[in-house]
């Protein structure tokens, strides 16, 4: 079960948009990560590579944890809101729940639940 301090450090890393670093620091070596009902990705190195690939296409990113965080033993649920402004001038706004299984101070399994329609980038509104 993660300590409250560990959860706060994890959330702070994600909110600082250090997504790849958060995976390196807070996931087990053989962690699984799954998007809705898709096939899970396995392995911390694969997750880090995926995060870096996504972030290489981002102009700006806002990551926000919406509290409260739900903790029940080794199970944690975090509500996130992300806003991606892509290099191609489009924007993606996503809200998701991350359902996590922690082994001590690291995440061993994580499933993201969200409406897949949110992943479709939209043209940035001129202001």
Residue ranges: model-predicted function:
Residues 2-6, 20-74:
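A solvent-exposed, acidic/Ser-Thr-rich amphipathic alpha-helical stretch
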Residues 27, 82-84, 98, 114:
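Short beta-strand segments enriched in hydrophobic/aromatic residues
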Residues 56-60, 84-91:
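Short, cysteine-centered beta-strand-loop-beta hairpins and adjacent loop/turn segments enriched
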Residues 62-65, 79, 92-98:
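Short, surface-exposed coil-to-beta transition loops
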Residues 73-82:
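A short hydrophobic beta-strand element
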């Amino acid at each position: 079960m993660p300590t409250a301090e560990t959860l706060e450090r994890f959330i702070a890393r994600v909110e600082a948009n250090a997504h790849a670093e958060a995976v390196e620091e807070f996931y087990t070596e053989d962690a699984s990560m799954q998007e809705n009902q898709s096939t899970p990705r396995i392995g911390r190195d694969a997750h880090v590579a995926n995060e870096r690939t996504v972030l290489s296409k981002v102009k700006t990113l806002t990551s926000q944890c919406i509290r409260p965080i739900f903790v029940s033993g080794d199970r944690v649920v975090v509500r996130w809101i992300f806003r991606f402004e892509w290099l191609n001038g489009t924007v993606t706004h996503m809200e998701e729940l991350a359902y996590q299984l922690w082994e001590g101070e690291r995440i061993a399994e994580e499933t993201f639940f969200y409406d897949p329609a949110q992943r479709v980038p939209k043209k940035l509104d001129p202001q």
